[in-house]
């Protein structure tokens, strides 16, 4: 399951609640073509990797979160571990790289 993040507080709470689990965050926008293309794949990964937390942040709805995380383009995927420490990031709708990065970190 992918959790939709609606606020900066909700983002921080989700990172805190994850504990030692890997958190994968998809920063996207409704108007972004590549974001729309990779969204179903991102959701399928959430079913496949049940021990990983998947979050979605709409950069238009949560500009403060996107700004704090220094998101410059969409889609951007960020990976967090252990109490919100960022351990990886890449931009672009690259399915293979997304799954490979999860496998490296999990």
UniProtKB/Swiss-Prot annotation:
A Pfam family matched in the record: Thioredoxin
UniProt modified residues of type N6-succinyllysine: 8, 95
Marked site (Contributes to redox potential value) residue numbers: 33-34
SUPFAM superfamilies hit by this protein: Thioredoxin-like
Residues the record marks as site: Deprotonates C-terminal active site Cys: 26
Entry PTM: In the fully reduced protein, both Cys-69 and Cys-73 are nitrosylated in response to nitric oxide (NO). When two disulfide bonds are present in the protein, only Cys-73 is nitrosylated. Cys-73 can serve as donor for nitrosylation of target proteins.
Keyword S-adenosyl-L-methionine assigned: no
One GO MF term: protein-disulfide reductase activity
Positions bearing N6-acetyllysine: 3, 39, 95
List of catalytic residues: 32, 35
Keyword Transcription: yes
A GO cellular-component term linked to this record: cytoplasm
PROSITE patterns noted in UniProt: THIOREDOXIN_1, THIOREDOXIN_2
Modification sites for S-nitrosocysteine: 62, 69, 73
Disulfide topology: 32-35
GO biological process: positive regulation of DNA binding; response to radiation
Role this protein plays: Participates in various redox reactions through the reversible oxidation of its active center dithiol to a disulfide and catalyzes dithiol-disulfide exchange reactions. Plays a role in the reversible S-nitrosylation of cysteine residues in target proteins, and thereby contributes to the response to intracellular nitric oxide. Nitrosylates the active site Cys of CASP3 in response to nitric oxide (NO), and thereby inhibits caspase-3 activity.
Membership in a protein family: Belongs to the thioredoxin family.
Subunit text: Homodimer; disulfide-linked. Interacts with TXNIP through the redox-active site. Interacts with MAP3K5 and CASP3. Interacts with APEX1; the interaction stimulates the FOS/JUN AP-1 DNA-binding activity in a redox-dependent manner.
Stated name of the protein: Thioredoxin
Organism: Pongo abelii
Source organism phylogeny: Eukaryota, Metazoa, Chordata, Craniata, Vertebrata
Gene that this polypeptide is encoded by: TXN
